Every structure is written in structure tokens, then in C-alpha cells.
Amino acid sequence: MRNTNPCQFFFLQMNRLYPFFIIGCLLSCNNIEPAKPPEVAVVKIPEKIDGKVAELLQITNKYVTENKGKLNDSVFLLHADLLNKIYEEGDFHPIWSSDEKWNSTADSMYSLVHDAKLYGLFPSDYNFPSLANIFSGMASDSLHKKNAALWARADIMLTDAYLGMAHDLKLGRLVKDSVTIRVDSLVTDSFFVQHFQEALAQKNIRGSLEQLEPKLKGYTDLKAAIPAFLDSAQLKKATYVFYPNKDSASLMKQVAARLSELGMVQAAGDTGLLREGIRKYQKQNNIPVTGRIGEKTVNSLNNSDWQRFKRIAVNLDRYKLLPDTLPHQYIWVNLPGFYLQLWNDDTLALESKIVVGKPLTRTPLLTSKITDMVTYPQWTIPESIILKEVLPGLQKDTDYLKKKGYSLTNDKGDEVFTSSVKWAKYKKGIPYKVIQGSGDDNALGILKFNFNNKYSVYMHDTNQRYYFARSSRALSHGCVRVQQWDKLAHFLISNDSLNAAPNVNTFKTDSLKAFLKRKEKHVIPVRTKVPVFIRYIGCTGINGRVKFYDDIYNEDKMLSERYFSNKPVI
């Protein structure tokens, strides 16, 4: 190496580095960005513009596919692979225009995107701002009509908008959960492509999309109430008030900003005026007038029209998780609405107030079937309640069960004296059952409805019937207390008689009355197993108006933030 002159040394080093140079070049070639479609491609002869649009559609499809759906900084296409398939099958001919003119299907599709909120959808999800710019430009500027790049861009955006709306109207945007029971094995990508092609052939864009919507009464009633809601709604982003908030200055600042948006506070930083604004707001919204910031006031402030619209969107999508048709008989329990409905052949046979679980002991969402009824039931306290309430109570006072009217038994059913147990050693449960005997004071009341579920919950009467007079009834340990339990029981018994085979003896309502009069415990099988749907529907449509329920478990808020938090107001 010492005898090597500088030139020889240079070439030796280059020979060593050359392979790495080649590899680097190859890697950089693989990272070359796809060719971007032109922003402008003017065609002066109208008869030739469709050919240029087809050429640009091929380039645009390739670019979007390789660029993972991104067309430019403001346009993202969610169905790039399907778009390529659709346009490739049509030799990349434009779908929505011809000879510098939109066809009728384009006008219909654009109108649907514009009116997406009427379906509980967000126009921005279907690139409405970019489409609006192109459509308005075409209408006002003849030079725009000669720009084949604009026609190609709009064409692919309209097709993507159809596919997006079709998916969202059919399946919704919520991820399936543990109670989702619809079967969508047939709803594949090819389903939406075929549906799109049929819509074009029949020139019925709106009808084809509306055909995909649920036909369930709850969905159609809520959707029908959206126009009236939008007519009076002020859809604009609002300051969100975080509560509780350890930073009192920050809390006051957020409240002041929100009240200012509502026109109730003008002077920033004036504590006296802010208190007055809070009082004024509380009075207008039927909140106890205190001038102080509390949970009810904050919940109301955060319930802006934009937040309400997002709740509508969430709840419309909840219906899309149900089967296309419901059974001809079923029990529908809506937790935030605090009601139970019994439907029989599309007729509301019974509606009852209910009491549901507290936020800390929520009633679970589930689907099941009524299996039997029990008169004068005893209550075996669930493990969850033992851990949260009973065990801490016993560790403080061994007479806790006696005061509650409960008894303690071992696995053989023998009663155990609470004073004989060292409760301090138990942390995660106890090897005993805690039971409340049957009777008028039993928490289950005098009748219980059983249905199979993994949560050990059921529906029942209650010894606290005064709860039904309250407007907010999230008060139980998780089971559903039914005010009209007697009417529900009579329906189930009569229903069994109607569906029984000839000459088959069935249970009679007179027998139920006798059991209850004698205060006897009996298990009454239900032969016609009526389905039970326990669901969380935060708003419903009633007589053309949206009725919003208190978001008792914050489920609407959670889903709105998860799926729709960054949606722009359009």
C-alpha cells in the first residue's frame, strides 16, 4: 500500500465501492414515484376530448393505485383497486361525461354527495369540496370544459364516491362488535362493483344507493327526521369543554369560549359576566340555575348541533349491524331510551318503562331468547356485585348481609354464619353464595324472565317500583327492571297457547295469577322462545323529529370520537 501511487489507490477504492453504487442505484429506481397525472390538459376540439379523458383516466388509475389512493393533497380515493378494475373493464372510457357535458347520472351522483348528510353521511368522505370546485368551474368557465384533466379527475372521484356511499349505506362505518349478528359473506367487493354497473345500466343512481339502506323501522324513522334537524341546526365546530379539569383557569376559558360561540358572553375575562352567562344558559336549557360549572352544564355545552349530527350518524350505523329483517316477534330493549318494546308482526304490542344498569354496572348489549319465567324468585348475588359491594361491606361489618336481607351459603346449600368467616383474607372473591330470599322485598320483585347469556343478567319486576317515576333510570346493578312485567308475562303465556299444537295443554294465565297470589316459586317454561335484543340507540326519530337520549354510558361520545372526530363541517 505504501508503494501505491494516488491514482492507483483511487481506482482500487472505486472498484471496491462500485457494487454498492450499483445496488444503491437499483434501490433508488424502485423508489421512483409514479408519474403524476397532469393538472391541465387542454383539448380544443370537443370531439377529441373523450379520447384524451380516457388516456388520462388510465394514467390517473395507475397513479392512484401505486400511490395507495392518494390523488393529490386534497383528494384521497378509498377504493383504488376497485376503480382500476371498473375502468379497465370499460377500456378507461369516461363514465360520467361525454363531449364536454355531464350526463344525467353525474348530476344525480353529485347531488347525492352534496346531500350526504340526509343519509347520516359526511360529504367530505366522498371528496365533495374538490368535486364542488370542478362542477362550479365547469358551469362558470368555458375553458374548464376543455381541460381533460378536470374531466378525468372528476370522473374517478364520482366513481369512488358511489362505491364509498354504497359501502357506508350497506355496512356502515362501525367495526362489528360481539353482538353483531348480520351475515355479510355475500357483500364483497364484487357485490359493490356489480351494483354500480347495474345502477349505470338502469340510470338510477339514487335508487340503487337507497336500495342498500336498512329497511328497519328504527332506521327509516331516524333518517326521516334528519331534514327537520338540519333545517334548524347550526353545524359548526364548537369549543369542547373538558370536565372534570384540575386546571380551573383552563376550564373557565373553555366555558367562556363556548358561551361566546352561543352568543351568551361577550366580554372575555370578566368573571361576573361569565357567571351571569352560565346562569342564563342553565335557565334556557332546564338545568338547575347555580351559576357554577357542573357535569350537567358541561354535558349540555358539549352537546352542539355538530356533535348531535355525529350521534345521528353513529346510531344510523348501529342499525346496519342488525340483520336485514328482524323476527316477526321480538323484544327490543333500548338502554339510553329506558324503554322496552314488544313487537308482534310489525305491530307494537307493548311498551314499558325500564330501569337499566348504572354506568359502573352497565347492562350489557346482547341478543338472546326468553327461555322461562320464575315466580317469586330468589336472587343469587352476581360475583361482580360481591366483589364491588358485598365483600367490602362484610370486611367492615359482619352484620352487613343481615341488614341487607341476604343470606350466606356454602356449595352444599348450607347456611354459613358471617361472624365465623375471616373476611379480611379474601381479596378476589369468596367461596360462598350470597342469596336474597324470595318475597315482596326481593330485588327481583315477584317475577323474573330468564334468557341465556354469559353475563348472568335477566329482566324482572322490582321492589323499587318508585324508580319508574324518574326520568333518568340508570340505577340497577345490570339487570333490566320492567314496569309492565305482568303484561309481558301474559303475552308470552298467550303466545304459547296460540302457537301450541292441537290437543297440547299449555300454561294458563290463571295459573300464573294463582302462583303470585300464593307467593309460590315456580319455573314456567316459555315454549315460543321470543328473541330479545338489548341495544344502545342514543337517538330515535319520532313524528319526524330526532329525539336525543342522555348518553348514559358515553357510548355515542366514544364512537363519535373514534370514527368522526376529524370530520370537517360542510
Predicted feature residues:
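Sec-dependent signal peptide recognition
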Residues: N15-I22
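Long, highly charged low-complexity segments enriched in Glu/Asp and Lys/Arg with interspersed Ser/Thr
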Residues: V193-H195
